[in-house]
Amino acid sequence: MPAKLGYWKLRGLAQPVRLFLEYLGEEYEEHLYGRDDREKWMSEKFNMGLDLPNLPYYIDDKCKLTQSVAIMRYIADKHGMLGTTPEERARISMIEGAAMDLRIGFGRVCYNPKFEEVKEEYVKELPKTLKMWSDFLGDRHYLTGSSVSHVDFMLYETLDSIRYLAPHCLDEFPKLKEFKSRIEALPKIKAYMESKRFIKWPLNGWAASFGAGDAPPS
């Protein structure tokens, strides 16, 4: 029986989970809640056996999880992809935290009612953060070495989202551009992105000042 992944019908926090599942070839069913489905979700939220009800949720047989990082860690652990030593596991946790910091920083700008005002400062400071990631990646193909892990999809998704706000943000960082292209070229990811199941837009919830709406900026 396939696992179930529930989230809003947008990219948001579920997109790295989707990408990771697709990369692994895991069979799963998506339960998507549209813009007008808030009442539907609220009617189901506390009746699904979730310990801490929220979106995204992931139900795999008896395992019922919420929180996107916890979901990805569970899936990674099932596939033996969480490291083999305390040092490796701690390093992966560190990357998760930094990737979430990047995502949260992007989200704060996108959901700010004064978006146009805060955007300028965000774009101005962005190169410092991107340089940190570029330096960390170095000559490796992926964040933990030569193999793909869930943290790669966490970073990829935020980088891809940021480019809608700052289209040329990666021009100074060829290693990050190559990393992004490398993820998109993975056969199963490429096939997913070309499928009807792939959600390109919106990036954020419908209350966002940026990344919502019916179509991406031209």
From Swiss-Prot:
CDD domains: GST_C_Mu, GST_N_Mu
An annotated GO cellular component: cytoplasm
Residue ranges of every copy of the GST C-terminal domain listed in the record: 85-203
N-terminal signal peptide: none
Catalyzed chemical reaction(s): RX + glutathione = an S-substituted glutathione + a halide anion + H(+)
InterPro entries hit by this protein: Glutathione-S-Trfase_C-like, Glutathione-S-Trfase_C_sf, Glutathione_S-Trfase, Glutathione_S-Trfase_N, GST_C, GST_superfamily, Thioredoxin-like_sf
Keywords per UniProt: Cytoplasm, Transferase
Known role: Conjugation of reduced glutathione to a wide number of exogenous and endogenous hydrophobic electrophiles.
Protein name per Swiss-Prot or TrEMBL: Glutathione S-transferase class-mu 26 kDa isozyme 47
Species name: Fasciola hepatica
